[in-house]
């Protein structure tokens, strides 16, 4: 197309940025072709590089100029945030609305600052290198510039939720520690995403290429008259029609032909079309409706977008489509990294009043009352509204507010310039999710519900919970929260004034067991014990503090025993505790060694000897010295003595001497030196032949060496080789005897005398070493020790055993006594509450050493007020066994508000709840939120209170009139929030759609078009009633807690979502087919179902990409979706030879069914099938292509069993076997035409081969083959 030179200006003096350069090259390319455009591009490149080099643009810290207005803007924003906080404190907005408003305030401030940065650079420093780089499009973008010199703004945490603390600093000023930590979330997220998602994106591209590689433009026109209406296209944008061909002619309003069918839609064509007042609907050709077999025709595909001309024959458009969809995935992966996880929440577009004036609009428009995310009331418009603003000078401005927008003003309302009057929802991929947020009480106090509609509900497990069905306030009437002792008796009623010593409650103290009273004076007289039982050793005295420890001397008939006490007096004892250890060196060794309890072979059992068997018998000790060393240098002097005999007192290591002498060995592996006392005997070769070489004991009088050496004592023989000679080491053995009879008895006196079997002191002997255990010690050990232990056979609840010293008549000596005490716990000892406690005292009704029977009242705990104040409330819902809760009003909880004319007080009365700003009379506003307690002549007394606004649907945890502490949960707000959409959601979403994955939490779909109503049955269960166009009524069950997406009486289309949730494409296809099959033939029903599903999938994929700012031409997505929706599954074979469950191409199945009908036979029945790209690749007509993708063994085995043929139509199969690919220069048009004709002609033969009725005999089949 030649350019119109009259319209082209000869010279333009404008600043050219990246976008202008792109437009310039596009126009050159469109008008002058590829050769001239490349020359222009080359010259532009040389020109720009020349001047860029000359200018030497570089970035320095000085170029990063922070706008002067930033400080002022941050200050104003903080004031606005504080105002929002005050609104929350008076209960005008909920905590969620406060959070959302705070986020929007900071987001708006960030955007204002961004605009200010632009204005500052443009007006003050247009040659700033940062400005030149970012806004020419050379390097960086506005988001990065904003973070450098504006503010970083709001960040989202790893869960995708926005943190309401913005980063107010920029990189030029530097971040604070807190800001840096918040900032690190996004940095880490970016790095992880880049690493993980690149692989996902690459794999997605591979699957897409595999599914679409055989789509090649094989013919110029398939001859179809079908297509898509312009309104059905996913982009739904007039300009996106460019590059397509008309499927039907366009007529003007007068009926004249404007453009015939198959006309290419160019920009000029669209501009001319816009000038027409009215014309017939536009229907365009599409790959979805192309009837070419295993390909797409030129006319249905349209332009090749790289050179804006009709696509060439032999073009591999499938691979182009796959790469066009897969490549942005890699780009998108990096997107998070570039912005560093910064949140930009432009979810709505605010409409501000262009001038001051009065609002007018027609009040008859359909709308519903709605509360915005910021807590403002407005109207949700159901239809477009024409808004008019008139000012006092008669100027009128009118503009349209579209449907689904929020209108925030009433008619006849006066508005100021720049006031927000409406919010328009942007068309972004908003992911709404239900969230919960707990409301915690900031102060302690009494709960009061104001205007709440409380309903008790039960969950699936039968647990009940309370919900609120109407917006209202939870008030916390302030006061100090206290817990009174358990089982206490409250003596006062709410509302009484309290003095300092007013008694609030008393708790009686009873004992469970009889005994003697002991009052512990050390615990301020509050500790009371009752001694129930005691046992005293009568044949033992304690010598206190002899050699820094107490000694216990026990006398028996034969001798005195000295024990060392191991337990301090007044200690609490447990079963088996050791009280004293006998001072006895009978069983003490001088060195380490090996202990054994029998003269059996050392390989016998090495279990620990039981205690009861140690009161009699013997054990045997084989002494041995062992010294550890850390380096060989320590034993270097002793190397010459290794494996020889050393004497007593000989130096082994520096400053280390042998105590016993003996056979010396250095063991380098264990880093130790051993000295084994004993005699060394050398064996002759003859003796070694007959000698028993096992280690063993030899008793006195027996031979060590047969017929040669007799031992005079018990020895232990060890056999070893040394310098190729054989030796025996006879080691001496010490024998320790444990007496058979008990030689120590304890005389014990019990009180009372009938209880002696429950508690006693026992003497036991213990060993601590296993049989044949080697003990390393240089100072010796006690092999057996005698202990006095505490034996408490029957523990009684509430009794505490204690060890005591009882004075005797002998000065400096005491008796050992163990007593059982019942400790009467007072409130101070028992309480584990973190709340500040009230003053408590214990009054005793008994004296020290008084005997009391069981269940005697021995005292009471008294709780007093402590300060002059007022008792506000007692929790009425607690039983007597729990801690009792009281609320006391302190002077700080009450505030005076002076009102000069109390008689004019008509607005409020005693008991009313008022918020900050409420009018008390005509002149005075309340400075506090609270309850009016009393009204005096000149002032009002207000009890401070905190209101919390809660919305409908909130789960309540507190109960009205109950008491709560600061930090207690009052309620859980249930609300919908918008999750920040990121490629972490975006790429898996695309993959989910392309793989046609099953969806969890499906939305309920309308089974037919009609009018939908929500109905409730007598059990309170909700259902959806759908009245179809033929007046057929269908009832659908609704799950509890599921929200509907329509208003009762709305018209809904077939397969549209009735409830919240994701739409499963499989469910949608089933719904569509089950509706259409009752109204059309199987072929038509299948075709219609596929078409609607294809449009849905294309729309969803495109929406996901566009939400990330990526634009892909619809024709690419159409090709992939066509491959996913090209198969059907046979349900019933009819009279053909197909089997139920077989998967066939839809077009092939339709042809076979047509032939069957023409022959007067029953065609097979089938249902449409949606396959994900992986399954579609595996179900490809080419088994070579499928086998090279996945599951090679299975695909090849099935193909071999079925005897399949591969017609080599795609690129992949040709590459694998080494043929020229049938695309580009390898594409033969005439050959393809012949092949297409042959394929169409073979349909009838295919039917006879594959679908002949089984009833006919083999002869018929042979006749057919001959024909």
From Swiss-Prot:
Which EC number(s) does the record attach to this protein? 2.7.7.6
Q: Where in the cell is it found?
A: Plastid, Chloroplast
Q: Which SUPFAM superfamilies match?
A: beta and beta-prime subunits of DNA dependent RNA-polymerase
Q: What Gene Ontology terms describe where this protein resides (cellular component)? A: chloroplast; DNA-directed RNA polymerase complex; mitochondrion
A biological process (GO) of this protein is: DNA-templated transcription
What GO molecular functions are on record for this protein? DNA binding; DNA-directed RNA polymerase activity; zinc ion binding
Give the cofactors, semicolon-separated: Zn(2+)
Task: Tell me which UniProt keywords the record has, alphabetically.
Answer: Chloroplast, DNA-directed RNA polymerase, Metal-binding, Nucleotidyltransferase, Plastid, Transcription, Transferase, Zinc
The family note in this entry says:
Belongs to the RNA polymerase beta' chain family. RpoC2 subfamily.
**Subunit structure and binding partners:** In plastids the minimal PEP RNA polymerase catalytic core is composed of four subunits: alpha, beta, beta', and beta''. When a (nuclear-encoded) sigma factor is associated with the core the holoenzyme is formed, which can initiate transcription.
This protein's name: DNA-directed RNA polymerase subunit beta''
Q: Which organism is it from?
A: Emiliania huxleyi
